[in-house]
Amino acid sequence: MKNNVQLLMPREKMLKFGISALTDVELLALFLRTGTRGKDVLTLAKEMLENFGSLYGLLTSEYEQFSGVHGIGVAKFAQLKGIAELARRYYNVRMREESPLLSPEMTREFLQSQLTGEEREIFMVIFLDSQHRVITHSRLFSGTLNHVEVHPREIIREAIKINASALILAHNHPSGCAEPSKADKLITERIIKSCQFMDLRVLDHIVIGRGEYVSFAERGWI
């Protein structure tokens, strides 16, 4: 009963001021709904964020890390993984249905939702039309912990198939550091040169790390 009373506070705050007015602790408490024995839901939410450092650290953690926190079991872990997956699917649908002229921020958020937490390097391409509206996106290549083999010819073939005019390249670094390697720069140059022959523009190559990213366009490399 105490947990339910405590939970009314963030709910009432949300109804009065909007969901964005909630703190990270209050927002997490809404999803958790109940606390544990001797610990109300707000206290539990606060302790979880302190243990994992942030919402990002919490939602990208693995069950082994959860099992070391008192009062957090498989049910809470499943709830939080469900939240993370819901966010990922939301961005997926948003990209398909809104398909506006992409802002750098929206592109980055979408790619982070798709690639963060992957244990292997994944190379993605967002395909756009002549107005830079999204046609589709695809995970074209999958590799190992620190390498992914990328074939420009396959990228061009896919672009021609769907009549794309521009591309945004992206891949993740499971190590967490988003700084591009020499190999990343070389393959980007190869893709750009190959695309030029087919009148395809490469707008950016974004590398996703753990809580950070690097944009080739922002660095002036494209």
From Swiss-Prot:
A motif (JAMM motif) lies at residues 171-184. The keyword Protease applies. Pfam families: RadC, UPF0758_N. Keywords: Hydrolase, Metal-binding, Metalloprotease, Protease, Zinc. Zn(2+) binds at H171, H173, D184. Gene3D superfamilies: Cytidine Deaminase, domain 2 (3.40.140.10). GO terms for molecular function: metal ion binding; metallopeptidase activity. GO terms for biological process: proteolysis. InterPro entries: MPN, RadC_JAB, RuvA_2-like, UPF0758, UPF0758_CS, UPF0758_N, UPF0758_YicR. Residues 100-222 form the MPN domain. CDD domains: MPN_DUF2466. Belongs to the UPF0758 family. YicR subfamily. PANTHER family: DNA REPAIR PROTEIN RADC (PTHR30471), UPF0758 PROTEIN YEES-RELATED (PTHR30471:SF3). HAMAP family: UPF0758_YicR (MF_00018). This is UPF0758 protein YicR. The lineage of its organism: Bacteria, Pseudomonadati, Pseudomonadota, Gammaproteobacteria, Enterobacterales.
